[in-house]
Curated annotation (Swiss-Prot):
It is an enzyme of class 4 (lyase). This is 2-C-methyl-D-erythritol 2,4-cyclodiphosphate synthase, apicoplast. PANTHER family: 2-C-METHYL-D-ERYTHRITOL 2,4-CYCLODIPHOSPHATE SYNTHASE, CHLOROPLASTIC. HAMAP family: IspF. The lineage of its organism: Eukaryota, Sar, Alveolata, Apicomplexa, Aconoidasida.
Amino acid sequence: MFLKGYTSNVVLIILTFFILLTKEEKNIKNNISGYCFLNFGLKKNAIIKKREKQNLKLFCYNGIRIGQGYDIHKIKVLDEEYNTYANNDFNKNEQSFKTLTLGGVKINNVLVLSHSDGDIIYHSIVDSILGALGSLDIGTLFPDKDEKNKNKNSAIFLRYARLLIYKKNYDIGNVDINVIAQVPKISNIRKNIIKNISTVLNIDESQISVKGKTHEKLGVIGEKKAIECFANILLIPKNS
């Protein structure tokens, strides 16, 4: 009796499994399963109608690339005591304090410790471009141990990254930048920064966003000892 009931249950399970497989195969052929993934709240008929109306293409990668860049540097405010030179434990080369440059704009009352000109905005954008293109990072391409890069204008790095975009047949969709600093006040120089980035990258100013955030006087940034920047970029294939 037990064996008979067990056999019946096994047959029922196999039959149910077969029906589900057949149904799923039909859904795959009709490309319904993918639509169920995107529109799990809709009934099947509604999904089919929506498909016919919008002619959606699922799981289609069109080559769009996104990159993120970051940079941070030590700073000194001129109304505070500072040394003109400082040793970097992570680098055998001696880095020097120089006038801070942000997006090509000189900030005369703030010094930055760096090997090149220390423009964290340009550096972050370069790194975001390199990341989006799957290239090497800025520190590898332009090492701070190389004397050729000492005090170098970071616009040169940015032009190099722009050339890579051109060679790989991409256009810039937009650039989004976040500067985290207690000083200087970004709103006072935002327009000039955007104009400079627009010129170097050869894109419209409307494609660039520059935002400034303080650190609420917390940590080394809040104590005016450092400044950092995040940059995100969207690259679009020219043939899309």
